[in-house]
């Protein structure tokens, strides 16, 4: 499927590879094969552990720019692994931007501050990343609470629990 899409254009192509969430995805070898056959495959949004992203980056030898998602889990380690950036969930975007800036700055003091900020937001990331449904239900509520917005669910959707709503606050 990806190859057919890539063959239909000369534009650079990005894909999202989320095997842990979708139950199907491309292995590191599969990504390498796809990129060799389709040089316009230039960007990957991975959805995996930082160690997996490091292996993808090493194996691709600079032929593929790699971002990771996963709501920002392992944010600092993903940047250390060579990800060019992250596409995290927006609940803590202001703090995630600061972490990225500090990691880009480099040095012991900047990285220590990045780790400190990451430790502050980690409970939020872990809370929302329990499942896709949980992420959609509670992630939007955390962001809305931070922005002072109302939440409007589209059905079908997970119904928040009283306990979950307490955690959002």
What is the meaning of each model-derived region?
Residues 6-11, 19-132:
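Catalytic alpha/beta core domains of metabolic enzymes, predominantly
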Residues 25, 156-159:
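Generic, ordered loop/turn and secondary-structure boundary motif
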Residues 160-169:
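Long, low-complexity C-terminal extensions of enzymes
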């Amino acid at each position: 499927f990806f190859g057919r899409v890539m063959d239909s254009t000369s534009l650079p192509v990005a894909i999202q590879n989320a095997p842990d969430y979708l139950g199907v995805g491309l292995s590191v070898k599969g990504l390498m094969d796809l990129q060799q056959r389709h040089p316009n495959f230039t960007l990957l949004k991975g959805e995996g552990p930082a160690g997996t992203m490091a292996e993808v980056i090493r194996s691709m030898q600079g032929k593929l720019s790699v971002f990771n998602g996963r709501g920002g889990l392992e944010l600092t380690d993903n940047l250390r692994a060579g990800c060019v950036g992250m596409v995290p969930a927006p609940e803590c975007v202001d703090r995630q931007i600061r972490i990225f800036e500090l990691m880009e700055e480099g040095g012991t003091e900047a990285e220590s501050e990045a780790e400190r900020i990451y430790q502050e937001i980690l409970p939020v990331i872990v809370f929302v990343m329990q499942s896709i449904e949980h992420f959609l239900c509670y992630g939007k509520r955390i962001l809305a609470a931070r922005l002072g917005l109302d939440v409007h669910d589209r059905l079908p959707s997970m119904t928040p629990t009283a306990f979950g709503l307490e955690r959002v606050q």
